[in-house]
Amino acid sequence: MIAWSLVATLQCKMTGKSSFYTCRALMGLFEGGFVADLVLWMSYFYSSSELSIRLSFFWVTLSLTQIITSIVAFGVFHMRGIGGMAGWQWLFLIERIFTLVIGISAYFLMVPSVVQTKKPWSKKGWFTEREEKIIVNKILRDDPTKGDMNNRQGMSLKMLWQGITDYYI
């Protein structure tokens, strides 16, 4: 989220076709898996029957956000000429700064799993040990294949590059 907001912010400096295509390609690269990853992350906390209502909240919120940002865009387009920038440049800059703030906040607030909610600056996690066991058991009863989720490992830059360049995907 942070990477795509930085690239999107750079869109306010686009000057031609090549910069447009470069920005859009990088946006697609960084933003492409966001929804799928968000659904996967939410599935760590909710059973399949609970997940559908949470995802409906996500999609409704997305639609409402698009309505609100359209109204904001109308006002921002009237900023044309300020600082030597066009209205569309201001729009990219302002909207993406909000995305950057949300991305940085998400980095600090989102946790890897139900049992890993403690942060260095917080002595308590989100749940008590009993609540963690209840949630984990509920998730495993709903989908036993999630029992091997704990074998995750960090991704190196080499592994990332192999994934990007694998043309069999």
Curated annotation (Swiss-Prot):
Entry's transmembrane regions: 25-45, 57-77, 91-111
Highest taxon above the source species: Eukaryota
Topological relation to the membrane, as annotated: Multi-pass membrane protein
Subcellular location(s) per record: Membrane
InterPro entries xrefs: MFS_trans_sf
Gene Ontology BP terms: transmembrane transport
Molecular function terms from GO: transmembrane transporter activity
GO cellular component terms attached to this protein's record: membrane
Keywords attached to this entry: Membrane, Transmembrane, Transmembrane helix, Transport
PANTHER family the UniProt entry points to: MAJOR FACILITATOR SUPERFAMILY (MFS) PROFILE DOMAIN-CONTAINING PROTEIN, PERMEASE-RELATED
Protein's name according to its UniProt entry: Putative uncharacterized transporter YOL163W
Organism whose genome encodes this protein: Saccharomyces cerevisiae (strain ATCC 204508 / S288c) (Baker's yeast)
Classification lineage: Eukaryota, Fungi, Dikarya, Ascomycota, Saccharomycotina
